[in-house]
Structures are given as structure tokens and as C-alpha cells.
Amino acid sequence: MDVTRLLLATLLVFLCFFTAYSHLPPEEKLRDDRSLRSNSSVNLLDFPSVSIVALNKKSKQMSRKEAEKKRSSKKEASMKKVARPRTPLSAPCVATRDSCKPPAPACCDPCASCQCRFFRSACSCRVLSLNC
């Protein structure tokens, strides 16, 4: 009886190894450098060569001036985009992504609905379908 258990255990171990190794991809053995070069997916000739160019003082100053102009234009653009205060909604409703925990009024957007999480401790108005 011990012999049959030993054979069954050996068979079980063999089957485990066989199933584990059957799912692994076969390894390709490269014999030399030539096969490595031919099998490599990245070819070094595909990349463009890099050229290093020395900058003179005039080009550095021009680039600094251009950078300052860009910075000043960005500052002016940001000053133009002053945040306007939101006007309060006349109807008693909850805006999208705001808290709608009951007994709050309904959501303002007709496509939105109040969704609660964490045992109704965090509720917010969310739009469920974009086709609405």
C-alpha cells in the first residue's frame, strides 16, 4: 500500500510540474552574436544621429528674450481669465458633483441622479449617461 501511495505521489508531482511548464513560453537559445543581432527587435540604425551645436551669446540672449515674452504673455492671459463668481441658482436644487445627502433637494441636471457611497455617508449628484 505504501508503494501505491509513493507512485501516486510521484505521478502527482510530475503532473504538477508538467502543467506548470506547459504554460511557460519556450525559451529561444541564441547560439552566437549573429543570431542576437538578427533577432533583436531594436535596430540601432533606426534612430537618427545626434548633432551637438554650440550656441553663441547672441542666440542665448534671443532665447532668453523669447522666454521672457512667453512668460509675460502667459501672465497676461492668466490675468484676463479672472474667475467670475458663480451666480446662485434660483431653483432649490443641487449642482452636479455637489453633496446631495438627504434631505437635500434634487439634482439640477435632469440627467443626473444622487449616488451615495459608504453607507450613505458620502452622496453626490452624478451624470450617469452621456446620451441623455
Curated annotation (Swiss-Prot):
Recite the UniProt keywords alphabetically: Disulfide bond, Glycoprotein, Knottin, Secreted, Signal
- Any signal peptide, and if so, which residues? 1-22
Write down the superkingdom of origin: Eukaryota
Q: According to its UniProt record, where is this protein located?
A: Secreted
- Agouti domain sequence ranges: 93-132
Q: Main subcellular localization, coarse class?
A: secreted
Asked if the record carries the keyword Cell membrane, the reply is no
Q: Name one GO molecular function term.
A: neuropeptide hormone activity
Q: Where is the composition biased (Basic and acidic residues)?
A: 63-79
What Gene3D superfamilies does the entry give? Answer: Agouti domain (4.10.760.10)
What would be one Gene Ontology cellular-component term for the protein? extracellular space
Q: Note whether Glycoprotein occurs among the keywords.
A: yes
Location of region: Disordered: 58-88
One GO term (biological process): hormone-mediated signaling pathway
Glycosylated at which positions? 39
Disulfide cross-links: 93-108, 100-114, 107-125, 111-132, 116-123
Q: What is known of its domains?
A: The presence of a 'disulfide through disulfide knot' structurally defines this protein as a knottin.
Record function comment: Involved in the regulation of melanogenesis. The binding of ASP to MC1R precludes alpha-MSH initiated signaling and thus blocks production of cAMP, leading to a down-regulation of eumelanogenesis (brown/black pigment) and thus increasing synthesis of pheomelanin (yellow/red pigment).
| Annotated protein name in UniProt | Agouti-signaling protein
